[in-house]
A protein has these predicted regions:
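Hydrophobic/aromatic-rich structural module bridging two neighboring secondary-structure elements via a short loop
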Residues: 79, 84-95
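Terminal, membrane-proximal amphipathic helices
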Residues: 1-79, 101-259
Length: 259
């Protein structure tokens, strides 16, 4: 999938920034240790906050994360203080880097609050599944149809438990592809199944144009709120909800393929 590989180059540059990587265990302990007894911390780390805490608490912490990241994005330079080699490797315009760095940081935090596993299992490199999860986070934040349903049903531990009871409804990669493709279009990349012009130079000006066209730091708050709203549906996620999400994904994939 040449289109996805090209867009991933942008993603891979941004995720190299130290500010982007959220250590799940440290984040969860920092945010929830005051709400729990010490003996509950292992359960928090193993099963996630949704196994121990009310939706009210989860939503409150999530909203605080949205507020904090919006403020950071407005006043912190993610490129300041970077080692020379890493700074030189970032070829994306600074304003684009800034926006996506804090968007991805916020998205990870919201994901961990509502039950997602550690995206950085290999510590240094993101797996393909982890990269797809980040793309879906951004897709939800940008309002791409089908991404919220796919994010919920496509692999989170809660959904995996539900899937065991209805294996015939399991998602296939053929359903993932059209929706991921649509997310990439939202990034401003002109996608074709035949491939794309090679090189980052074709991507960066488009991303810069999207940003200057209104994708500013001020939009991060509603984008974060959109992701929080959809992820919060994972609290008490049921078989009925899973089936509804799968049907939404199937319909959206058919619509996209018919375009």
């Amino acid at each position: 999938m040449a289109e996805q590989e090209l867009a991933m180059q942008v993603l891979q540059q941004v995720v190299k920034l130290p500010v982007v990587k959220v250590e799940r265990s440290k984040f969860l302990v920092d945010k929830f240790s005051k709400e729990l007894d010490p003996q509950d911390i292992p359960t928090l780390l193993e099963q996630g906050p949704t196994s121990l805490l009310s939706q009210e608490i989860l939503d409150r912490v999530a909203n605080a994360c949205i507020r904090d990241n919006v403020l950071l994005a407005s006043g912190t330079s993610v490129l300041a203080g970077l080692p020379g080699g890493l700074a030189m490797a970032i070829t994306i315009p600074a304003d684009v880097t800034q926006f996506y760095a804090f968007s991805l940081k916020l998205a990870q935090e919201l994901g961990y609050i509502y039950g997602y596993e550690d995206l950085w299992a290999s510590r240094e490199e993101l797996s393909e599944d982890a990269q797809n999860t980040l793309l879906l986070y951004l897709g939800v934040m940008l309002g791409v149809n089908g991404t919220a349903a796919l994010l919920r049903a496509g692999g989170i531990t809660i959904a995996k438990q539900v899937m065991k009871t209805i294996p015939n409804k399991a998602l296939t990669k053929t359903l993932w592809y059209p929706i991921l493709k649509k997310v990439l279009k939202i990034f401003g990349v002109n996608l074709t199944k035949g491939g794309l012009a090679k090189g980052m130079g074709k991507v960066i000006p488009i991303l810069g144009g999207v940003l200057s066209g209104g994708l500013t730091f001020a939009t991060m708050k509603p984008m974060g709120e959109s992701l929080q709203k959809e992820l919060s549906k994972l609290v008490n996620y049921s078989e009925v909800q899973y089936q509804e999400d799968v049907e939404t994904i199937r319909k959206e994939a058919e619509i996209i393929e018919g375009e």
